[in-house]
């Protein structure tokens, strides 16, 4: 399976660079992982059209006044989402990728103190400890989406809408890489 994946932008001494969490290589072991550059001039349409799954990864912020916000990444991801939807690709959102997909498809995110932690979600009759590294929760999800997991405070942590599945946590940073079965398209 070919999996195209967005990357976080990290600012370092000599300028920005794209980065991908090492956990994705073990999470998607046995599949071809294709990183998507955060510059439209280097993006190739066939990165999406030739892929079986498009992953919108975590990292950076969706909040424009946050120092970790990156406009160039947002532009690339909007383009990738438009192509993915046009070609009816399977889509997986992880953490910030879930926030991006939620907002892009009509939902919203809201600030939440104390959410940058490991915490428990309830999904498919199981209680699973997951890892979150953001300061926001989902205020609402896209119309027609099904809730797959909630935390103990009742916040939605995972949803699915047709061929789009999202988790608000970081499965790539968990030993089990756990996600609800309904959206484990790479297995």
Where are these regions (language model features)?
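Active-site-proximal beta-strand elements of phosphoester/diester hydrolases
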Residues: 129-130, 165-170
